[in-house]
Amino acid sequence: MTETLKTGIPAVDRYLGTGYDQVRGFSSRYSATICGHLLRRQSELGIRGSVAEIGTFEGRFFIMLGLAVGEGERAYGFDLFAWPGSQVLERLLANADAHGLARDRFTPLSFDTGKLTAQEFSNLTGGAPLRFIHIDGDHFPKALTQDLRLSLIHI
C-alpha cells in the first residue's frame, strides 16, 4: 500500500490531491508536495515572508505556493504569459479561481526576469526578502543564471 505524501497544509493537500493534475504545467506533484512541506515547516519555525515563482505559466505549481502562504504574505508569479498563446494569464486566473486561490493573495507579473535589475525585482515583490522562490522559467544557461542571481539576492 502506498501512502500519499502530505504537506500538512489542508488547502495545499486538497489541491494536490484533486486539482493539481487538472492544471497544465510541467512540475511534478512530488516536487510541489516537498516544497509545500518546506513552506509549512518554515511557518512553524516563524519564518515568514512572501514567495515567488519565475515561470508561472498556467499556475500548476504557483497555486500551491499561493495556498501555502499565510496572512499578510503574497505569492508573486513572473511570466511573459505569451506562450503557447495569448490567453495564458487568463488561464492562470481561471485556474486560481477554480482551485480556491483568492486573488488578493497573489500578484501575476508579466515581466521578462532576464531584463530586470535586482532593484526592479525587489520593488515588484514588495521590497522585503522572499522566503521561497521557485525557478521554472527559461531553461537556457544565461537566463537561468540571471534568475538564480535575482533569487540569491532576495532570499
Residue ranges of each PLM-predicted region?
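S-adenosylmethionine/decaboxylated-SAM
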Residues: 4-29, 36-153
